[in-house]
Amino acid sequence: MDKYTELVINKIPELGFVNLLSHIYQTVGLCSSIDISKFKTNCNGYVVERFDKSETAGKVSCVPISILMELVERGMLSKPDNSKSQLEVKTDLVNELISKNNGFEDIMTIPTSIPMKYFFKPVLKEKVSKAIDFSVMDIKGDDVSRMGIRYGENDKVVKIKIAPERDAWMTNTSIHQFLIPMCYGTEVIYIGQFNFNFMNRHAIYEKSSVFNKNTEVFKLKDRIRDNRSSRFIMFGFCYLHHWKCAIYDKNRDFICFYDSGGNNPNEFNHYRNFFFYSNSDGLNRNSYLSSLANENADIDILFNFFIDNYGVTAGCINVEVNQLLESECGMFTCLFMAVCCLNPPKGFKGIRKIYTYFKFLADKKVTMLKSILFNVGKMEFTIKEVDGEGMQQYKKMEKWCANTINILANKITSRVEDIIN
């Protein structure tokens, strides 16, 4: 809650102001980022950029011309006219492919060297939850705000019922369909989502034994074994009906956990090689007197599992709360793993940058990203611009940043020139 106190009491627009800080941190190399401009259409721009180096990349269709030429070589499409430009050839091939098949899903069943669906944003089957800017929420961030409006808090607040929206909960399928293409061709492999809710009803001292005997653990071991060639192994897991995730670096014997709900270091067992990342204090170990709470048993068990089975020598987890509402933990973990695909955490410096990215992320921005990173409309094989509510809100936020940057630049330049001159 600390990170929202000043924003809420002073009614600073959280989305614009925090987004501006995020840009500053990214520019000076203090945090990781994800380029939203690569999702302005129905394409996954990162995948297109990774595999399509032609002049037609991201034009006509998300699918590269090289993939379409595979279909020509197999006799599924007509040979192109060599006198035409690449763009004209691609247009002809796309139109022919559409005419010969019964819609988008039919085209996606055609086998190619890289699955064609990887170049498109996956369809969003879930609802986008209702969230608002925290600066207009009635959050009692300190003693003054708890004393009432007349003691300083602006009365411009919006009452919102904080309750889970089950229709907005991310399914394993949606997370899988987004992350598999994001990882494809990188040194990171996503091995799926794991359900550890079977431990929920057991006492803390029983959980480790129950965990090691469950078939879900054998599935985890099998998938790690099947992906020996990848440096980073990444997966999500659910415990007490809350989603978290982890990324394991095989080269450095290092595992990083992420929990959008935040963590209290005093509610974990103490290990000399397990660290807690706080935005204000950095990476630190907890007290020797700390004891494990039930809600953190999954992290404790997984850390020991990786020590015993894979020789992990260090681990870490975030401290700060990133998520206040109760519906989007799946989206938070999905986004964390996506950032890990783009910026794999090679040691503590790398994971610090990823955790810091989430310092500037809250429920409202996540809901915007949910409707931008996924396709909320009908799937089309041709390029379509995204103009939904999420993108409109995101553009509005970025315009606020652009205007504010110009104002700041002018004011700061004026002050500096007064000093220099």
Swiss-Prot record:
It is found in: Virion. Its EC number is 3.4.22.-. GO terms for molecular function: cysteine-type peptidase activity. Pfam families: Peptidase_C57. Keywords: Hydrolase, Late protein, Protease, Thiol protease, Virion. GO terms for cellular component: virion component. The active site is at H242, D249, C329. InterPro entries: Papain-like_cys_pep_sf, Peptidase_C57. SUPFAM superfamilies: Cysteine proteinases. It comes from the Viruses. One of its GO terms (biological process) is proteolysis. Induction: Expressed in the late phase of the viral replicative cycle. Belongs to the peptidase C57 family. Late protein responsible for processing most or all of the viral core and membrane proteins known to undergo morphogenesis-associated proteolysis. These proteolytic events are involved in the transformation of immature virions (IV) into mature virions (MV). This is Core protease I7 homolog. It comes from Fowlpox virus (strain NVSL).
